[in-house]
């Protein structure tokens, strides 16, 4: 059975190993090894063996499960920390004299017990003793130097062409609204209001306004518009229907001419031309196309 002196000596050795582990982490020396803690503690113990082996085995079973879980955690953390610990601050890989004097068991137990003691804040040389370890993606992105981030020059931020929304400077404006090509109530030019108006030779407009109307109305927006389209009748109605209906229109026209000539011939003979008789003759006539 262990005496209080053995317990105190083991605790003092763990504290001393923890301090040396912090110094080694600050120097950037990789000392993390995944040696089982149970075998290291059993071989390094200076006290007498337990009196009751069965009782000792029963009491260590829950602890062994916890140590196995901790060993898995240590192995995962060691894979994360090794790339950072392999880079020393000054490129000096020489060992400390105190590190050379320690036994291999102490070198294995010290980093393992320091991780079990929740001292995970001194793994990186650039971090302080009390700063938490940042393993998130945002912190890694924030730790990048500012020179690597893409920066835009003032020339790239500006647009390649002037915007039609922004106003030009007061010195560049040589005209007022009455001289601009858009129609409004303040126009002094006579004639109907239109968007396309012949420009005045004595006035010049804002280049921003010119660019706006050139994009909206085309390159030749200053040219006068042609006269509004008026309805022009070319040809006669007969020509129009002859082109549209063809032979059908000729048949209709012949039927109309025959119908109009029949009342005139009847009146010349002295026979009355009643409308009912005319309608009956039309209804029985096979040549009439309604």
Curated annotation (Swiss-Prot):
Sites bearing Phosphoserine, chain numbering: 52, 149, 274
Keywords for the protein's UniProt record, in alphabetical order: Acetylation, Nucleus, Phosphoprotein, Transcription, Transcription regulation
Main localization category: nucleus
Amino acid composition bias (Low complexity), ranges on this chain: 272-290
Entry-annotated residues carrying Phosphothreonine: 153
One Pfam assignment: VGLL4
UniProt-annotated stretches for the region Disordered: 17-65, 85-106, 140-161, 254-290
Localization per record: Nucleus
N-acetylmethionine, modified sites: 1
GO CC annotation: nucleus
InterPro entries: TDU_repeat (IPR006627), VGLL4 (IPR028184)
Transmembrane segments: none
GO molecular function annotation: transcription coactivator binding
Signal peptide positions on this chain: none
Listed Polar residues bias regions: 150-161
Role according to the record: May act as a specific coactivator for the mammalian TEFs.
Family membership: Belongs to the vestigial family.
Subunit structure: Interacts with TEFs. Interacts with IRF2BP2.
Name of this chain's protein: Transcription cofactor vestigial-like protein 4
Gene: VGLL4
């Amino acid at each position: 059975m262990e005496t209080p002196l053995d317990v105190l000596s083991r605790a003092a050795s763990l504290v001393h190993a923890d301090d040396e582990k912090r110094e080694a982490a600050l120097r950037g020396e990789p000392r993390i090894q995944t040696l089982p803690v149970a075998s290291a503690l059993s071989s390094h113990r200076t006290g007498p063996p337990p009196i009751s082996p069965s009782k000792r085995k029963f009491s260590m079973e829950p602890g062994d499960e916890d140590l196995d879980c901790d060993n898995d955690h240590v192995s995962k953390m060691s894979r994360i920390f090794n790339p950072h610990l392999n880079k020393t601050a000054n490129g000096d890989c020489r060992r400390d004299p105190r590190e050379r004097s320690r036994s291999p068991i102490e070198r294995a137990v010290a980093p393992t017990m320091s991780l079990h003691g929740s001292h995970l804040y001194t793994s990186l040389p650039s971090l302080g003793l009390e700063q938490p370890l940042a393993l998130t993606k945002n912190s890694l992105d924030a730790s990048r130097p500012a020179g690597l981030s893409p920066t835009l020059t003032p020339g790239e931020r500006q647009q390649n062409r002037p915007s039609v929304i922004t106003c030009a400077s007061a010195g560049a404006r040589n005209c007022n609204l009455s001289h601009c090509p858009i129609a409004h109530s303040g126009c002094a030019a006579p004639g109907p209001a239109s968007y396309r108006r012949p420009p005045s030779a004595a006035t010049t407009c804002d280049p921003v306004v010119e660019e706006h109307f050139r994009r909206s109305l085309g390159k030749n927006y200053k040219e006068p518009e042609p006269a509004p389209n008026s309805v022009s009748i070319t040809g006669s109605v007969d020509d129009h229907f002859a082109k549209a209906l063809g032979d059908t229109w000729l048949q209709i026209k012949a039927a109309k001419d025959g119908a109009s000539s029949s009342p005139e011939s009847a009146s010349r003979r002295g026979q009355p031309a009643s409308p009912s008789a005319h309608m009956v003759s039309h209804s029985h006539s096979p040549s009439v196309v309604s």
